[in-house]
Amino acid sequence: MIDIGAGSTEYLVCTDGVVRHTGVLAIGGDHISNDIAYGLKVPLGRAEQLKIEFGSAVVSSENPGETIGLSNDEAGMMPTKVNREHLHQIISARLEEVFIILENEMNRLGLMDYLRNGIVITGGVSRTKDLQRIAERVFQLPVRIGESPDIQGVHAVREQP
């Protein structure tokens, strides 16, 4: 299981109810937002919004040059539109980096055989469009997005995988 949260990525390898390995990478969704802010020259808050509303883990050749219009509701100089393909390239590069680091770690520790039934990805970043596709490409294993248990309480909490 891989849990990609805002500030970190936690992972757990478990078979037959036995935990084989756990670990943490200090890379998470906030790093993707920082990359977007830097790469597209937009404020961090706007970068987070772009990631959530328009982000994808896969760069598509459909509609090359398509742009996303930005309202000018923030002070300072910023672009009025950004290239959708560039946004997706930034997201894809960071996610691919995370998955390659994890795959290298699993290979180094001899744990890939424990993952043959597949990988479950959870956390806020798991909601990124096409995340499953990039993970399957890197790991060469089946990947699924984990679902939140049906819990009582704040509605927003239940929407988080």
Provide a role label for each language-model segment.
Residues 1, 10-161:
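Helical "lid/coupling" subdomains associated with nucleotide-phosphate turnover
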